[in-house]
Amino acid sequence: MASEAEKTFNRFAAFGESSSSGTEMNNKNFSKLCKDCGIMDGKTVTSTDVDIVFSKVKAKNARTITFQQFKEAVKELGQKRFKGKSPDEVLESIYGLMEGKDPATTGATKATTVGAVDRLTDTSKYTGTHKERFDESGKGKGIAGREVMNDNTGYVSGYKGAGTYDKKTK
């Protein structure tokens, strides 16, 4: 059960921190873990309680907590959340709440293709000259797909289209 709690701890510790290794958690992510896992219920355990417990268990000049400090914080919050239970039962209850949880990303926008957007972005449905702008895989050809390119090489600077002289005279 503790290993599952440690995995959840690591997932929340790394959430939103690109440079984080996931071994230490800051106050913001600790509050998020408590809220998302249901440890903070808003009545017996509030966000203020979570912040106070975080400040108690972290080192004096540190900004983050390790998993060992996290276990102490969870015990303290659990005593408040589950009154009348033994410390071991409290820890098991908290770990049960945390089991298999991931950081929730509510309010994050997701790309959707609806109606016209789907039709306009699918290059296989293009017609006319527009369909020549893309290869079979749907990747754009660039300027080669938009314009007819003449080869501007020849013996004289004004002569355009090398190799076309023989075709004209015959």
From Swiss-Prot:
Q: Where in the cell is it found?
A: Cytoplasm, Cytosol; Cell projection, Cilium, Flagellum
Renumbered to this chain, region (Disordered) spans 127-147
Tell me the domain of life: Eukaryota
Pfam families, alphabetically? p25-alpha
Biological-process GO terms, alphabetical: cell differentiation; microtubule bundle formation; microtubule polymerization; positive regulation of protein polymerization; regulation of flagellated sperm motility; spermatogenesis
- What coarse category fits the chief subcellular location reported for this protein? cytoplasm
* One term of GO molecular function: tubulin binding
**InterPro entries membership:** EF-hand-dom_pair, TPP/p25
Task: Enumerate composition-biased segments (Basic and acidic residues).
Answer: 129-139
Q: For this UniProt record, give its keywords in alphabetical order, as a comma-separated list.
A: Cell projection, Cilium, Cytoplasm, Differentiation, Flagellum, Spermatogenesis
GO annotation, cellular component aspect: cytosol; microtubule; sperm flagellum
Under the heading SUPFAM superfamilies, the entry gives: EF-hand (SSF47473)
Q: Which family does it belong to?
A: Belongs to the TPPP family.
Question: What job does this protein perform?
Answer: Probable regulator of microtubule dynamics required for sperm motility. In contrast to other members of the family, has no microtubule bundling activity.
Instruction: Write the protein's name.
Output: Tubulin polymerization-promoting protein family member 2
Q: Which species is this UniProt entry from?
A: Macaca fascicularis (Crab-eating macaque)
